[in-house]
C-alpha cells in the first residue's frame, strides 16, 4: 500500500511540475527577433492568456504559460525562447524581488488606432512598419472618423507624422510645385469643406481638441516626429491664426506669438513660433532645427535611456525596456525636443547626453497619458521624401523600434498600487 502511495505521490509531483512549466521569451542580446516577440505577446493576449512582463529582467522579458500552440507560433515567427520549470520560475521571481526589477501583468490586447490619411502607405510611418512587422492588428482613422467619436472604441492612438497647425508640413518652399504636395493640400481642403470648416487649420484644431478629450478620458497617446510639437502648437494657438497666407488665404495674426496659451498644451511651453512659410521649421522646440540641422552623423549620434525604479515607477520602466541603454539617433521633421521648453511635470525618458536634446518623454493628462518620441524612423538616420521603406526583416533587433512596441503593450498592463 505504501508503495502505491509513493508512486501516486511521484506522479502527482511530476504532473504539478509539468503544469507549472512556462515559456520565457528573453529580450536580451540573445534574442533573435525582438520585434516579433512583441507580436507574440500581443497574440497571447488576443487569445485570452495573460502575459507577465518581467521589467529589467534580461532586457524586459515575457513569461507565459507553456502550450503547444504558443511554441508553434514562436517557431513560425522566429522568436527565441526557453522552457522554465517550476524551480527555475521561482529563481526568476527571487531575482526580480532582489534587484531593480518588477513583474507587470498584461491582461488584455489593447485596441489600436493610427491617425493617418486612408491612402498613406505603411512605410510612411515607423509605427505602421512596426505594427505590420510584429503582426499586430490596427485600424486607420482620419479626421472624419475622429470627429465622429470613433476614438472611444480604442485604447491606444498613434499620431501619424501630421502637421496639426495646417501648414502642410512647412514643405511649401521646396515642394509646392510637386504633384504630391498639391494633392496633400487638395485632400485636406476637401475634407475641411466636407466637415464644415473654413480652413484646414480649424479642422486640425478640432481634431487636436478631440484627441485631447480622448486622452483626458483615459486614452493612451503615442506620437512621433512632427505630430509631437505641431500638436501642442495647435492647442496653444487655438485662439489665434499662425498660418501664413500661402497656407490658408489670409495672413497670420501679427500678435499670434503673444496670444499663445501654453496652459493648454501637453508637453511644451514658452516656445517661439517660426511662421515664415519659406522656413522649413515650425518653432524652436525642434533640436537640431530642420532648417539648420547640425548633423553629428549616424555613427556619432546616440541618445541614452534613463534607468527608473521598476518597483516604484513601473510606467517609465515599461516605456524604456530595451536590451541596450544607448540608442542610435535618427532625424525627422521634429528630431528632438529642446529641454528648456519641456514642462516640468513631464518625465524625460531619453536624451542626448551633454546636449539640450530630449528624445523621448512621457506625461499624464486627466485619466490618460501621452508619450512623444522625436525623429522619423529609428533605422533610417536621415529620412527624405520618397525614400524607400525600411525593411524591418533586416533590423529584427532594433533598439529604437523596441521603444515604439513598448508603447503598444503599455495599455495592456494591470494598474497596481505603488509600493510606499
Which residue ranges define each predicted feature?
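Extracellular/periplasmic catalytic domains that process cell-envelope and extracellular macromolecules
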Residues: 105-108, 149-152, 214, 341, ...
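Extracellular ligand-binding/catalytic regions of CAZymes and related secreted enzymes
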Residues: 21-26, 32-63, 241, 339-420
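Alpha-helical scaffolding within the catalytic cores
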Residues: 95-100, 144-146, 355-359
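Catalytic beta-strand/loop cores that center a nucleophilic Ser/Cys/Thr
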Residues: 122-125, 132, 229, 240, ...
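Catalytic cores of eukaryotic secretory-pathway lumenal/extracellular enzymes that build
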Residues: 181, 196-197, 236-239, 244-247, ...
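Helical hinge/lid and interdomain linker segments adjacent to catalytic or ligand-binding clefts
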Residues: 22-23, 28-32, 63, 67-72, ...
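Hydrophobic targeting/anchoring helices
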Residues: 19-125, 134
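Sec-dependent N-terminal signal peptides
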Residues: 3-14
Amino acid at each position: 500500500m505504501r508503495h502505491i502511495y509513493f508512486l501516486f505521490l511521484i506522479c502527482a509531483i511530476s504532473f504539478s511540475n509539468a503544469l507549472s512549466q512556462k515559456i520565457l521569451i528573453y529580450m536580451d542580446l540573445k534574442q533573435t527577433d525582438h520585434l516579433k516577440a512583441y507580436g507574440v505577446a500581443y497574440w497571447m493576449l488576443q487569445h485570452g492568456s495573460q502575459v507577465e512582463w518581467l521589467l529589467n529582467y534580461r532586457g524586459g522579458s515575457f513569461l507565459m504559460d507553456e502550450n503547444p500552440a504558443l511554441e508553434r507560433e514562436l517557431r513560425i515567427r522566429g522568436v527565441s525562447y526557453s522552457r522554465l520549470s517550476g524551480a527555475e520560475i521561482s529563481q526568476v521571481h527571487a531575482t526580480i524581488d532582489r534587484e531593480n526589477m518588477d513583474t507587470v501583468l498584461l491582461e488584455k490586447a489593447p485596441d489600436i488606432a493610427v491617425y493617418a490619411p486612408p491612402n498613406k502607405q505603411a512605410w510612411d510611418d515607423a509605427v505602421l512598419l512596426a505594427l505590420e512587422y510584429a503582426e499586430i492588428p490596427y485600424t486607420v482613422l482620419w479626421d472624419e472618423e475622429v470627429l465622429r467619436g470613433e476614438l472611444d472604441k480604442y485604447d491606444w492612438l498613434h499620431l501619424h507624422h501630421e502637421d496639426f497647425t495646417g501648414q502642410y508640413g512647412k514643405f511649401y518652399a521646396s515642394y509646392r510645385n510637386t504633384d504630391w504636395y498639391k494633392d496633400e493640400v487638395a485632400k485636406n481642403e476637401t475634407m475641411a469643406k466636407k466637415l464644415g470648416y473654413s480652413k484646414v487649420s480649424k479642422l486640425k484644431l478640432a481634431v487636436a481638441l478631440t484627441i485631447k478629450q480622448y486622452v483626458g478620458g483615459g486614452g493612451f497617446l503615442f506620437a512621433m516626429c512632427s505630430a509631437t510639437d505641431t500638436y501642442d502648437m495647435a492647442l496653444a494657438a487655438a485662439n489665434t491664426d499662425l498660418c501664413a497666407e500661402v497656407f490658408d488665404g489670409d495672413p497670420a495674426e501679427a500678435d499670434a506669438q503673444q496670444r499663445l496659451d501654453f496652459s493648454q498644451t501637453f508637453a511644451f511651453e514658452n516656445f517661439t513660433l517660426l511662421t515664415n512659410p519659406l522656413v522649413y521649421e515650425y518653432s524652436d522646440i525642434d533640436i537640431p532645427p530642420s532648417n539648420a540641422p547640425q548633423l553629428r552623423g549616424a555613427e556619432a549620434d546616440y541618445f541614452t535611456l534613463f534607468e527608473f525604479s521598476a518597483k516604484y515607477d513601473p510606467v517609465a520602466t515599461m516605456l524604456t525596456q530595451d536590451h541596450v541603454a544607448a540608442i542610435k539617433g535618427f532625424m525627422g521633421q521634429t528630431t528632438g525636443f529642446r529641454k528648456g521648453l519641456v514642462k516640468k511635470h513631464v518625465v524625460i525618458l531619453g536624451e542626448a547626453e551633454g546636449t539640450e536634446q530630449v528624445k523621448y518623454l512621457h506625461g499624464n493628462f486627466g485619466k490618460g497619458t501621452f508619450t512623444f518620441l522625436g525623429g522619423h524612423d529609428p533605422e533610417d538616420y536621415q529620412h527624405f521624401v520618397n525614400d524607400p521603406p525600411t525593411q524591418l526583416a533586416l533590423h529584427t533587433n532594433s533598439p529604437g523600434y523596441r521603444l515604439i512596441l513598448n508603447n503598444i503593450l503599455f495599455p495592456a498592463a494591470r494598474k497596481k498600487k505603488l509600493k510606499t
